[in-house]
Amino acid sequence: MSNLKDIKRKIKSVQNTQKTTRAMKLVSTAKLRKAEEAARYSRVYALKINEVLSEIAYKINQYASVVSESKFFDIKENIEKVDIIFVTADKGLCGGFNVQTIKTVRHMIDEFKAKKIKVRLRAVGKKGIEFFNFQGVDLLETYIGASSSPTYEKAQNIIKDAIDDFVNGVTDKVILVHNGYKNMISQEIRVNDIVPIEPSKIIGVETNSLMEFEPEDNYSKILDELLTKYFEYSMYYSLIDSLAAEHSARMQAMDNATNNAKERVKQLNLAYNKARQESITTELIEIISGVESMK
């Protein structure tokens, strides 16, 4: 009987877990729809910003060569210092979502160290911060709350210090890493070089835009201000994209957990029925044996 009670208690425990994971899946599904929509609109907006920036940069470049004046285009042959901004979630229970980002960052650190390049980490998200703190790795800056509740202001604060350090020569390169949303069932790691910028990526060929303007003096300042906005929005988009991917990963993880719990309940029910049958058989044998002994 004690064995039956243990199995019944396990069944109830797994069923309670199943209810929790099912509820979390529904919550993640609802949040994913909202985050997916935000990511889609942000992607369109980011493409438009890039288009406008390219057009303005092209026209400015017709008046003066701003590339040589802007520090954002200062590509060094021998890089000595690199800043990596990486985004993870503030919460867990999202499968390998955070692990993939952390693995990518660790691999990048190893590659840079092999080339004698110093790496500084700027961590966005509680899970990434906790991991590297546990590993005893120094973090230059930490940001909690930006990945779970992204805003443009938070993105500005994160990217500003890194860009300032690049402009002031404290670091030679800034890289942004996050796990991005691909579709409802998959995510992909995205690694983007923020600065320095390859001139051909911004100042390329003239677009078909009908925009006409004649820039004022100080062309470099105009372009630098535009690029600063571009950097800020790149950071903001990575936060939104990461959040959508996080909800997608959590929805999957909770769906898998719910299915596993369902399968476990089936196994425990079989074990319970088998144990109950054995118990009944034993009782019948005891009754029959008792009757036989009385004859």
UniProtKB/Swiss-Prot annotation:
Keywords: ATP synthesis, Cell inner membrane, Cell membrane, CF(1), Hydrogen ion transport, Ion transport, Membrane, Transport. One of its GO terms (cellular component) is plasma membrane. CDD domains: F1-ATPase_gamma. It is a peripheral membrane protein. Pfam families: ATP-synt. The keyword Electron transport does not apply. InterPro entries: ATP_synth_F1_ATPase_gsu (IPR035968), ATP_synth_F1_gsu (IPR000131). GO terms for biological process: proton motive force-driven plasma membrane ATP synthesis. It is found in: Cell inner membrane. One of its GO terms (molecular function) is proton-transporting ATP synthase activity, rotational mechanism. Produces ATP from ADP in the presence of a proton gradient across the membrane. The gamma chain is believed to be important in regulating ATPase activity and the flow of protons through the CF(0) complex. Belongs to the ATPase gamma chain family. F-type ATPases have 2 components, CF(1) - the catalytic core - and CF(0) - the membrane proton channel. CF(1) has five subunits: alpha(3), beta(3), gamma(1), delta(1), epsilon(1). CF(0) has three main subunits: a, b and c. PANTHER family: ATP SYNTHASE GAMMA CHAIN (PTHR11693), ATP SYNTHASE SUBUNIT GAMMA, MITOCHONDRIAL (PTHR11693:SF22). This is ATP synthase gamma chain. It comes from Campylobacter curvus (strain 525.92).
